[in-house]
Amino acid sequence: MKRYDCTFVGDINPDIVMMAQQLPVLGRELMCDDFYITLGGSTGICAGVFGNLGAKAAFYGRLGDDFLGKFTVETIAGCGVDTSHIRVDHGCTTSVTVSCTLPTDRALMSYDGSHKRLAPEDVPLSLIDETRHIHVGSFFLQKDLMPMYLELFRQAHQRGVTTSLDAGWDPTENW
């Protein structure tokens, strides 16, 4: 029997959500209606929901050694996700997204600190043997891992492990 139902690889960070009726104007301060800080990163959110459903999940990712990194690890662990494979990087700050959320849409601004430091050595191919499914998220934010993903998926399929890929947004829009 496999240790995990799904192993997640990708972006994880806190989201700071600011709710307002309009976007701020440069040079002025806009008071928002409400705000909250929550688990973010498309892969992190997916893993958190999966864990909250009672499934066995693990996460491979990187966070900074700071308050936001600690918050993120504690939050996803509270969802029942195994965080032992999340690397704490003492040389960078945790990635973060600020969402200016209006009643009908949102505008996002992100800092890509720890995400871009996720490296192939952080994601050993041995994870294949411990899981039934591998989900990779935010493909375009993981530049250093792109070449490895093909081999990860190939070996997973050879061993009967299913896979999924959420490409996410390409900040360069080169798709």
Regions picked out by a protein language model, each given a short descriptive name:
Residues R62, S95-C100, M109:
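Catalytic-core segment of enzymes that process non-peptidic bonds
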Residues D34, G61-D65, S84-T93, G168:
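Beta-strand->loop->alpha-helix junctions that form or flank phosphate-binding loops
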Residues P14-V17, Q21, G91-S99, D122-S126:
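Short, compositionally biased "basic patch" segments
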Residues M1-I12, E74-V88, L102-W175:
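Ribokinase/PfkB-type carbohydrate-kinase core domain
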Residues M1-R62, F67-G78:
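Glycine-rich phosphate/adenosyl-contacting loop at the front of the ribokinase-like
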